[in-house]
Amino acid sequence: KIRVDVNIGEGGSSWYGTMHSGDMNSIRIGNVVNVQDGSVLHTLYEKSTIEIGDDVSIGHNVTIHGAKICNGALIGMGSVVLDHAVVGEGAISAAGSVVLSKTIVEPGSIYAGVPAKFVKKVDPEQAKEINQKIAKNYHMYSSWYKE
């Protein structure tokens, strides 16, 4: 379900049971982004927006609340990313992680846990390859549902 001020780029897909709630503030989603089943994107009135770059995968049952997700990032299943957090380019938020408000997830790194903490750097090319593969696969899957 999509409400009010939401913009989704080319090749984007939102799967079953997702909610993009742009009634409080804007949500901008880049190209070839997939928001998987059960995820919620929400903002705070006059305080936070959501900005999602290109080639991003947002796993099942993720909550993103007023955060920035940069190009090529992967938000693992069941993660929570809170207001004013930034998930850097090619970064991974591991499944079940809680990225607290104002946390900066470094580009090309893995953060995990509750609260999410730095785990390790990943090879930038390997991360890009994995994250783009997932994003492009979901782009392909979405074509199966077009009439």
Model-derived features with residue positions:
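A positional/architectural concept
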Residues: 1-43
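Glycine-rich hexapeptide-repeat left-handed beta-helix
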Residues: 23, 29-31, 37-40, 44, ...
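Short proline/glycine- and basic residue-enriched helix-capping loop/turn segments at helix->loop/beta transitions
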Residues: 57
